[in-house]
């Protein structure tokens, strides 16, 4: 297919420089485009500029028949729609065949979150006498205290911290920045790590690393590394938890709203562009639901 590499190179530069997307978002976009490129090759379509709306429908039908989830298909549509919007802007194609495609309706699922007792146990398993244990504790406390995305956590530098006001400057999606405060537990864990564990880890580095959270070799910690660390910490707990890093973000939002925080403030803290993205967290935990019921229903208690 002609000019594919040129198209992709230009698009990647656009995502990096103009949109300021993370490398993980860009990898997802490129994967969707390459998947579409393979489809075009099988269909005998010569180039991106030759794609029509019926071709897009066939592609999406095949994706559905392969068993891809609505969420995955939506991501592919979003990536390809953005790609064609870019190509159209650069006058490399004459139309965007994905404009007429609507995103599949998503199943409304309540985000999984941790209860406070589960969190407390997780906070007790790190060995604070070791550099890695200090890092793990700071990582856990910071994810829960700020609700930031793992990619945002991994990109934090010391210059982003304001230890006088206990706030952190987070560099979010699309060049958007926001300040998030953090509490005394996160501050204590962070101080221990910065003053001890991180300094020891830096001694193992081949070159100075500006990022706050480091791997065991003194290099920058990756989101994949965070997932591994969480998995190892969970193994040390007594329960059968299955935790992914984003669950701590879900937990952050759920706990704030359950304790009375207003939706707009939580939206700001999470860095959501749309309030609808935050509203998914307005579910009520089963414990709170039961307490409310038992406190207010006239026939909740016999003999009242």
Curated annotation (Swiss-Prot):
Signal peptide: none
Keyword match Disulfide bond: no
Gene Ontology annotations of biological process type: cell division; chromosome segregation; DNA transposition
One GO cellular component, as annotated: cytoplasm
Keywords tagged on the record: Cell cycle, Cell division, Chromosome partition, Cytoplasm, DNA integration, DNA recombination, DNA-binding
Active site residues per record: 149, 173, 246, 249, 272, 281
Domain of life: Bacteria
A Pfam family it matches: Phage_int_SAM_1
HAMAP family to which the protein is assigned, alphabetical: Recomb_XerC_XerD (MF_01808)
Function: Site-specific tyrosine recombinase, which acts by catalyzing the cutting and rejoining of the recombining DNA molecules. The XerC-XerD complex is essential to convert dimers of the bacterial chromosome into monomers to permit their segregation at cell division. It also contributes to the segregational stability of plasmids.
Family: Belongs to the 'phage' integrase family. XerC subfamily.
Protein name from the UniProt record: Tyrosine recombinase XerC
Species of provenance: Bacillus licheniformis (strain ATCC 14580 / DSM 13 / JCM 2505 / CCUG 7422 / NBRC 12200 / NCIMB 9375 / NCTC 10341 / NRRL NRS-1264 / Gibson 46)
Lineage summary: Bacteria, Bacillati, Bacillota, Bacilli, Bacillales
């Amino acid at each position: 297919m002609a000019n594919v590499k040129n198209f992709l190179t230009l698009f990647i530069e656009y995502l990096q420089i103009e949109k300021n997307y993370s490398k993980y978002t860009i990898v997802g976009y490129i994967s969707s485009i390459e998947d579409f490129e393979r489809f075009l090759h099988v269909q005998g379509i010569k180039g991106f500029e030759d794609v029509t709306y019926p071709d897009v429908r066939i592609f999406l039908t095949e994706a559905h028949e392969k068993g891809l989830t609505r969420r995955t298909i939506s991501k592919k549509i979003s990536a390809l729609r953005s790609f064609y919007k870019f190509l159209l802007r650069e006058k490399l194609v004459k139309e965007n065949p994905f404009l007429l495609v609507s995103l599949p309706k998503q199943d409304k699922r309540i985000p999984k979150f941790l209860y406070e007792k589960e969190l407390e146990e997780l906070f007790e398993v790190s060995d604070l006498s070791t550099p890695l244990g200090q890092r793990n504790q700071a990582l856990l406390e910071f994810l829960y205290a700020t609700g930031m995305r793992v990619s945002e956590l991994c990109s934090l530098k010391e210059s982003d911290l304001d230890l006088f006001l206990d706030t952190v400057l987070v560099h979010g999606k699309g060049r958007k920045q926001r300040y998030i405060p953090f509490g005394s537990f996160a501050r204590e864990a962070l101080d221990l790590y910065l003053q001890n564990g991180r300094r020891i880890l830096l001694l193992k580095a081949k070159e100075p690393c500006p990022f706050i959270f480091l791997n065991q070799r003194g290099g920058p910690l990756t989101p994949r590394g965070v997932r591994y660390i969480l998995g190892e910490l969970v193994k040390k707990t007594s329960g059968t938890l299955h935790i992914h890093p984003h669950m701590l973000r879900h937990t952050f939002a759920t706990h704030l709203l359950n304790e009375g925080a207003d939706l707009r403030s939580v939206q700001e803290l999470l860095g959501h562009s749309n309030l609808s993205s935050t509203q998914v967290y307005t579910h009520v935990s089963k414990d709170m639901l039961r307490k409310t019921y038992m406190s207010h229903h006239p026939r909740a208690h016999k003999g009242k």
